Amino acid sequence: MSVTGTEIDSDTAKNILSVDELQNYGINASDLQKLKSGGIYTVNTVLSTTRRHLCKIKGLSEVKVEKIKEAAGKIIQVGFIPATVQLDIRQRVYSLSTGSKQLDSILGGGIMTMSITEVFGEFRCGKTQMSHTLCVTTQLPREMGGGEGKVAYIDTEGTFRPERIKQIAEGYELDPESCLANVSYARALNSEHQMELVEQLGEELSSGDYRLIVVDSIMANFRVDYCGRGELSERQQKLNQHLFKLNRLAEEFNVAVFLTNQVQSDPGASALFASADGRKPIGGHVLAHASATRILLRKGRGDERVAKLQDSPDMPEKECVYVIGEKGITDSSD
């Protein structure tokens, strides 16, 4: 059974329950405001946040937190459910086109919602170009592989170019100014700021208008802020929390999360992470486990680029060729 774009939108909106609903279960308005100040805007987020973390929010005692948790549990069932219900939830998943039909094909339709997709590769492979292309294709109608929605873009390296968005939008015959207006942009100054920006996303996403979160690139700030083996453990703990939050946002708001990542040379790298030439994505096991889909990008012949699907819960390993043009990521003319 196919699910239409309208049905997906209505289902997503129906499942986004504001914390204001808790007022009907005895939680006063001042405590709800405290939740919002702590970056918690929906009932689902209340349920997925630990009591220990909720108690860290200024003004919330253990007694209040327990009462809030109890009220949230009355609104949304969090125990065992029939697998048929989970099937209904999975049917709300849809894909966003990358701009390349060949790449969309090996991905099973495109970048999937409710999960994290990571692309990694050396410089000039098209990671940022793919991010820019997705900013436009996400706004296309459903029948054209879009999501008819907005994009939240976190830029960690200062490589976001609004003029490039306008150029790609013109290639798709969309209004350039409207496309730019539908992209919420933030420059992450360091890893701490990057994590804060993701915490703040709950308020934006609770509108139900967003379809995609882009982080370009996920590890740049963490590499700078945590240097050497002595800080590696702390870095991975922070990264794990960051990725956990992104995954929660993807599931709760039915959005796609698209991460770009850098690579490092490691001649002795294990086959689990490394490509044939020994390059491997940074972030280790933490990032590998968080990303549902991992795609290696590399340079091909001439202007061609090669995308290899390395890990996916839905599709087998496969690769395809794409090029970077005025419309962003497109198919090779060959």
From Swiss-Prot:
| Binding-site residues for dsDNA, renumbered to this chain | 223, 229, 235
Q: Which GO terms describe its cellular component?
A: condensed nuclear chromosome; nucleus
Q: What is the effect of changing residue 126 to D?
A: Dominant mutant; phenotypically null
Q: Which UniProt keywords apply?
A: ATP-binding, Cell cycle, DNA-binding, Meiosis, Nucleotide-binding, Nucleus, Sporulation
Q: Which domain of life is it from?
A: Eukaryota
Task: Cite the binding residues for ATP.
Answer: 121-128
Gene Ontology biological process terms in this record:
chromosome organization involved in meiotic cell cycle; DNA recombinase assembly; DNA strand invasion; meiotic cell cycle; meiotic joint molecule formation; mitotic recombination; reciprocal meiotic recombination; sporulation resulting in formation of a cellular spore
Q: Which SUPFAM superfamilies does the protein's record reference?
A: P-loop containing nucleoside triphosphate hydrolases, Rad51 N-terminal domain-like
Mind telling me which SMART domains this protein's record contains?
AAA
GO MF annotations for this entry? ATP binding; ATP hydrolysis activity; ATP-dependent activity, acting on DNA; ATP-dependent DNA damage sensor activity; ATPase inhibitor activity; DNA strand exchange activity; double-stranded DNA binding; single-stranded DNA binding
Q: Does the keyword Ion transport apply?
A: no
Q: Where does ssDNA bind?
A: 223, 226, 229, 235, 305
Against Pfam families, the record matches this protein to: HHH_5, Rad51
Give compartment(s).
Nucleus
InterPro entries cross-referenced by the UniProt entry: AAA+_ATPase, Dmc1, DNA_recomb/repair_Rad51_C, DNA_recomb/repair_RecA-like, DNA_repair_Rad51/TF_NusA_a-hlx, P-loop_NTPase, RecA_ATP-bd, RecA_monomer-monomer_interface
Q: What does this protein do?
A: Required for meiotic recombination, synaptonemal complex formation and cell cycle progression. Recruited to meiosis recombination hotspots by MEI5 and SAE3.
Query: Which protein family is it in?
Result: Belongs to the RecA family. DMC1 subfamily.
What is annotated about its quaternary structure and interactions? Double stacked ring-shaped homooctamer. Forms a ternary complex with MEI5 and SAE3. Interacts with RDH54.
This chain belongs to the protein called: Meiotic recombination protein DMC1
Q: What is the lineage of its organism?
A: Eukaryota, Fungi, Dikarya, Ascomycota, Saccharomycotina
Encoding gene (name): DMC1
